[in-house]
């Protein structure tokens, strides 16, 4: 896997306009409710899922994974400084939404296949993976 320290620092990916627009897109793709479980692979600072959590008043804090331990990460999520394959292979949790955004292109083909296979098996009924 590749480490790109602070690659999205102060860019459009962190802008409120982009975050709101992306969450609007997510909510058009999948019906989520306050008891939905959300995982964001390559979450960066976690702003997207933190905003989604606030919007839906999620009961369970969303989980964000990133290989970079950002100092200014959101306090509204459970942040795990780990690689996706390690976490997703070990967790017993199932999710209604798994986001893999701005990340998958950093993986090798073999890692992508393995990650998608494991993610598929970690979805609740009617859960979705959004890439």
Model-predicted regions and their roles:
Residues 35-44:
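Conserved class I S-adenosyl-L-methionine
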Residues 2-21, 25, 29:
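Class I SAM-dependent methyltransferase Rossmann-like catalytic core
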Residues 102-103:
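Short catalytic micro-motifs in class I SAM-dependent methyltransferases
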Residues 113-125:
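A short glycine-rich, Lys/Arg-flanked "PGG" loop and its adjoining helix->strand segment in the class I
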Residues 45-86:
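Class I SAM-dependent methyltransferase SAM/SAH-binding core
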Residues 99:
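A conserved beta-strand element that flanks and buttresses the S-adenosyl-L-methionine
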Residues 126-131:
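Conserved beta-strand signature within the Rossmann-like core of class I S-adenosyl-L-methionine
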Residues 86-92:
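Short conserved loop adjoining the S-adenosyl-L-methionine
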């Amino acid at each position: 896997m590749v480490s790109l320290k602070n690659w999205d620092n102060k860019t459009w990916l962190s802008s409120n306009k982009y975050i709101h627009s992306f969450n609007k897109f997510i909510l058009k793709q999948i019906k989520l409710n306050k008891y939905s479980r959300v995982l964001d692979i390559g979450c960066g600072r976690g702003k997207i899922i933190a905003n989604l959590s606030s919007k839906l008043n999620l009961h369970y804090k969303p989980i964000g994974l990133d290989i970079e331990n950002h100092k200014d990460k959101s306090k509204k999520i459970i942040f795990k400084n780990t690689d996706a394959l390690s976490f997703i292979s070990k967790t017993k949790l199932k999710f209604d939404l798994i986001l893999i955004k701005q990340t998958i292109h950093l993986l090798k083909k073999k890692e992508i296949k393995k990650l998608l296979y494991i993610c598929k098996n970690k979805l609740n009924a009617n859960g979705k993976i959004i890439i």
